[in-house]
Amino acid sequence: MKPLISVIVPVYNGQDYLENCIISIENQTYDNLEIIIINDGSTDRTGAICVKLKEKYDNIRVVTLEDEGVSTARNAGIDMAKGGFLTFVDADDRLRPKALEVLYDSILSTGCDVAGCRFQTFREEPEWQGQLLTLHRIKEPAVYKPVEYLKKEILKGNSRCWSKLYRRSVVGNIRFQKGLSIGEDMLFLMELLPYVKKIAETDYPGYGYYQNPKGAMNREFTPKYMDQITCWEIARDKAMAIDKSTESEITTILLMSIMLVAGKIALLSLPKRRQQRESVRICREKLKKELKVPGAYEGLSKGYRFKVRLFRTAPGLYLALYHFRKYR
C-alpha cells in the first residue's frame, strides 16, 4: 500500500465551496488519504457541512478553532497529521483527480523532499469543470537544490504552500508564523529550505485556484495589509542566511510590495485615506530606507521607478493621482 497522505484544509465561512473542494480531494486517483478539516470559527453553515462530510467519508477528521487565523489552523492540521506526507488545500480551491498521484510520483522518481505543481485559476464552477476536460501530458519534473529553488521559483512568484506535497519528516517542527495575514506561505517555505535536499517542480496544472472576489487581496485596505511588507522583510533575512547575493533582488521585491500597499491605501475614499496617515508615513520611511540597498532601485521596471520617485517626494500627490487614475 502507498503511504498515507494527510490533506490539511483550513476553512472559514466556506459554506458555498467547501463540499466541492472535499469532493475533489476524495476523487483523487491516489487513494490512501486522510483529510483534516480545520473549521476556524466559521459563523455560517460550515460547521454543519463539516459534520455532514465526516459522516459521509470515513477518512475525514474535523477540528474546530475559535477564529485564530489560517496559520494557526494549518499548524493544527500539521500537529494532527498521521501521514508520511502532507499537503495543503484552501477550502475554496480544487484538485485535479491526478494531482496527488503526480506529486507523489514526482517525489518517488526524483528522491526529493518536496514536489510542487502548477495551478489554474477559475471564477465559476462551470469554468473549472471545463478545465477538467483538458488533458495534460505529464512530463519529467525539474529538480532544484534549495538555493536554486529560492532564486528560480520563490523569488519569481512560486511562494505558495498549497499545490505542493511535503515529506512529513522534513516538515518536522516547522510551523506557519502566527500573526501574519499575508505572506505566511512564503515564510513557511523559507523556513523549510535549509532542511530539504532537493525540490521537484512539475508543470502539470494539478491545482485549481479560485479567484474569490471576497478574498483577502480583494478587500479594502486595513493596517493588516502592512503584513505584506513585514513578510518580505523577514523573508530577506531568511534568504540571506541561505545566500547573501539575494539581498538586492529581494529588496527590489520589497520596494514593489511597499508600492502595492500604497496603492491599496490610494483606493480608499479621501476621508478614509486621511485616517491612514500613519500607514502612509511608515510606507514612505521604509521606502527611503530600502532605496539605500545597492542594486534594489535598479532592479525595478521603469514604471515602478517613476512610482517610487513620486511617492518618495510627494506621497499625497501620488495617492491622489493613483486614486484619480483608477476611478476616473
What role is predicted for each listed range?
Residues 70, 91-200, 207-223:
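Donor-binding/catalytic cores of nucleotide-activated saccharide
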Residues 86:
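Short aromatic/hydrophobic "clamp" motif used to bind/position activated sugar donors
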Residues 1-27:
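N-proximal low-complexity "stem/linker" segments adjacent to membrane-targeting elements
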Residues 65-81, 102:
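Glycine-rich, basic loop-to-helix element that forms the pyrophosphate-binding segment
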Residues 24, 31, 39-48, 66:
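A conserved acidic beta->alpha catalytic loop
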Residues 16-19, 33, 44-53, 94, ...:
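Acidic helix N-cap motif at the loop->helix transition within catalytic regions
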Residues 267-328:
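Membrane-interface aromatic/basic loop that binds lipid-linked glycans or pyrophosphate carriers
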Residues 197, 204-212, 218-245, 260-291:
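Catalytic core of nucleotide-sugar-dependent glycosyltransferases
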